[in-house]
Amino acid sequence: MLILDRLLTGLHDACAAFPDKRKGAGDYSMADIGLSAFSLFFMQSESFLSYQRSLEEGRKTSNCHTLFGMAKIPTDNHIRSMLDPVHPSHLQSSFDQVVATLREKGGMKQFERLGGRTLIALDGTEYFWSQKLGCPHCQTRKRSNGKTEFYHAMLAATIVAPGHNMVVPLMPEFIAKPDGAGNRTASAMPPSAGLPRTPRA
């Protein structure tokens, strides 16, 4: 639990440093907004935040407070609105901290194979596509029916080891097209196109 608390503190600090497009003080801190998004992935439940808000209203506390140290729970729409402009690179320190903590505690030794080497698995994946919604940073493709699809993709890197049932995700590279070109390249995605946030439409 001490290691988890340390990692959550690092994530809290990274989220607190997110650029804030609001000109005045908002109802929710950027730390609470970022941690709310993280909690959805951590708990793997789309209804997690709405249920926690109902607990907060009835009991004045929730798992968001006790597990993630959040002060207030924003709505899903507010989370999307505030995180859209945040560049993924603001989370680099959180990914680095996971590896650094494992090295410090000797956890990386479990992943060493082939004479002390660390194996990294690479996988390209799409995390958004739509025939209705698109943005200037979307990749595009034509289907046989003539319709255009818009999509975002990334190259995911993960530390793995044969016979080990756990993996360590590294900072992904978001696949963006260069300005004025149609070819794809792995690079840091421009603002508003970074974090997985929108379901298929």
Annotate each PLM feature:
Residues 80-164:
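Active-site-proximal, Lys/Arg-enriched surface segment
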Residues 48-50, 62-74, 91-95, 109-110, ...:
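Short, flexible active-site-proximal loops enriched in glycine and acidic residues
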Residues 10, 14-18, 54, 82-85, ...:
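Residues that form generic nucleotide/phosphate-binding pockets
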Residues 142-201:
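Electropositive, glycine- and tryptophan-enriched low-complexity nucleic-acid-binding patches
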Residues 51-58, 93-106, 185-191:
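Short, motif-level signal for alpha-helix interfacial/capping segments enriched in acidic residues
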Residues 3-74:
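Gly/serine-rich nucleotide phosphate-binding loop at the start of the catalytic core
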